[in-house]
Amino acid sequence: MYENLYSLIQQCGTIGVTSHFRPDGDAIGSTLGLGLALQAMGKKVYMWNEDGVPARYAFLEGAEQIVPVPEEIPADLEMLICVDTGDWKRLGDRTQKLFADFPQIVNIDHHGTNTRYGHVHVIEPETAACAYVLFNVLKSWGVQLSKAVADALYVGISTDTGSFQYGSTTPEVMHAAGELLAAGVDVADVNRRVYQEIPYSSLLMQREVLNHMVVECEGMLAHYSMPAGRKAELGVGLEDTKDLVDVVRVLQGVRVAVIFEDLEDGRIRMSLRSKDPSVSVAAIAAQFGGGGHAMASGIRMAGQLEDCRERVLNAIRKELSHE
């Protein structure tokens, strides 16, 4: 599988790398890690993301190369590689339209709900992170990892394992992290930048969640809803709403946590997390056209906040009542 992709890449001079909108650490780390590695292999590389690079990951060397998706496909582009993106729709509207008929799309991912879009697939379901998949890919190709590539892949693995707290953290994952440290990752510096420098606006958003979250089902279900206009009232931005579900998830006794966010475009965004392996939020999300992992999934649903919320909560309540 890895060898086939290597052969295809060797035939290309110019490659694009992109990932899902509202990128997390794994999306950015995977895009940058692969992009920089391909450059080291002598390729011309474009790196794109519809929403750009979140501020917390801007310290990564080369992050400025990840730019908005262009209006037109570059004339010299021969291959598009999509990383950490389980569904074509998650790439964003502009990317979908621009590359709808592109002849060579590679799908590298770790989501169990991957829809297998594209022409070439390297999909390892429920692996710790896409960055971990890429670590193994690059290692199999004999690529020498620079500090910049190692930093990017480490951020991807660390953030998608909850800083190595989740069940996906296997001995193999820890061994990979050790190899990345040996390649130059400064763990203290990376952890400080990613986890210990939170903007004041993000703390305001966390306070909002703590003040207004709802706990039900005998403490097993916790959720918070952000109505239209609330971000503007609080003076917070899009990036401040990232990872809010973790504020709810850590409450003692909670097995499922959900954040509902009115996107003000007729759609509701939902982030679902499970702390119980017997409750798959991926299965719940799939009922509403969403997907992801068993312990972490998302949904985007058209409709009113109250209606969408109740439909999803009822599905979760039903699942919890079966226990």
Residue ranges and their predicted role:
Residues 2-18, 29-58, 74-77, 159-323:
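Hydrophobic helix-and-loop "lid/oligomerization" segment in the mid-to-C-terminal part
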Residues 18, 22, 82, 107, ...:
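Generic enzyme active-site microenvironment
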Residues 25-31, 88-92:
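Short glycine/serine/threonine-rich phosphate/pyrophosphate-binding segments
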Residues 48, 81, 104-108, 120-123, ...:
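Hydrophobic/aromatic beta-strand patches that form the interior of the parallel beta-sheet core
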Residues 62-66, 123-126, 275-276:
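Short, hinge-like loop/turn segments at secondary-structure boundaries
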Residues 108-176:
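Short alpha-helices
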